[in-house]
């Protein structure tokens, strides 16, 4: 079928891991707090302040409910990057005189890896756990990495590039048994997969508003109260957020995050069914029409809104240019500006050639069946054309192992 026939509104948004569109119900909930309900939630002497404070506390309880936390355990931040920094650096600063070791994973989000590298310069020892070819960590390797000096294990819930879901419950059990704090960057999983901080023994969890159809510039950090977890603040000031994060709270953004969490709580099952159906339709139709396409990351232990594919014999950059009617990404949005192959794919043992051909397709709440079908038609027709032009594809067809070729450097 010619993709130009039956085309939906173009371009089609398929980059839901980078950000999500604002749910109209979220926008509606936020608007009054930009206009008539403009009070400072920390003003205690008049109704404008009380009104804002009530709205903030309601949002806090909505965020808490989605992960089975207590309302008082939610600290509002500017987003998951700040939450990750506060969790990792905050623990290191508070407990660093007693212990000096942190464990994380090679495939974590860049802000976690960079926070850890920063701490290495301050004398903290960091262990970067490898991942298996399916993108998931090995629990025995984690057990063996923990020492009596380990203060924190930081493992994300859902990987932003390949969508795999790490075994949080098992990791939490290991950490609790060994007396080590467990932090998880749950930005890509919050509101999309069931996460219960008590069942999973999570001590700190980082949340982002704009990954769950909420506004940008707002996030949260869950900090366990029992047994109590202490973090040294990164920002000093008026002592807001139980002293962990000073600064006037942005009421409209917090109301938006709360509403997004409330919606996710009620429609998570429906969203999951929708995304799983579109994942199967997208993947099966592509596999039926073109060969040598590989799904990166475990097929079952993943959030299926993330479809990271490698197309053998074609450069990822040329695919993105060819399918410009689809808004997609080659890796995480923070690093897709660099032409280096993804460090996440490389850490799974995927060769440089195949890593360079990978594209991340993101589907979500507002993706339609028509958009998925259009995307499949467009991708298949363009990949066929690009492969006809590709000397690499010719070599693959002739059975030449690209890994064994010695490339000339200019």
From Swiss-Prot:
The active site is at 334 (cysteine persulfide intermediate). It is an enzyme of class 2 (transferase). This is Cysteine desulfurase IscS. Pyridoxal 5'-phosphate binds at residues 80-81, 160, 188, 208-210, 248. InterPro entries: Aminotrans_V_dom (IPR000192), Aminotrans_V_PyrdxlP_BS (IPR020578), Cys_deSase_IscS (IPR010240), Cysteine_dSase (IPR016454), PyrdxlP-dep_Trfase (IPR015424), PyrdxlP-dep_Trfase_major (IPR015421), PyrdxlP-dep_Trfase_small (IPR015422). Its EC number is 2.8.1.7. NCBIfam families: IscS (TIGR02006), PRK02948.1 (NF002806), PRK14012.1 (NF010611). It catalyses: (sulfur carrier)-H + L-cysteine = (sulfur carrier)-SH + L-alanine. Coiled coil: none annotated. Homodimer. Forms a heterotetramer with IscU, interacts with other sulfur acceptors. Its cofactor is pyridoxal 5'-phosphate. Pathway: Cofactor biosynthesis; iron-sulfur cluster biosynthesis. The keyword Cytoplasm applies. [2Fe-2S] cluster binds at residue 334. The modification N6-(pyridoxal phosphate)lysine is found at residue 211. The keyword Transport does not apply. It is found in: Cytoplasm. GO terms for biological process: [2Fe-2S] cluster assembly. GO terms for molecular function: 2 iron, 2 sulfur cluster binding; cysteine desulfurase activity; metal ion binding; pyridoxal phosphate binding. Keywords: 2Fe-2S, Cytoplasm, Iron, Iron-sulfur, Metal-binding, Pyridoxal phosphate, Transferase. Belongs to the class-V pyridoxal-phosphate-dependent aminotransferase family. NifS/IscS subfamily. GO terms for cellular component: L-cysteine desulfurase complex. Master enzyme that delivers sulfur to a number of partners involved in Fe-S cluster assembly, tRNA modification or cofactor biosynthesis. Catalyzes the removal of elemental sulfur atoms from cysteine to produce alanine. Functions as a sulfur delivery protein for Fe-S cluster synthesis onto IscU, an Fe-S scaffold assembly protein, as well as other S acceptor proteins. HAMAP family: Cys_desulf_IscS.
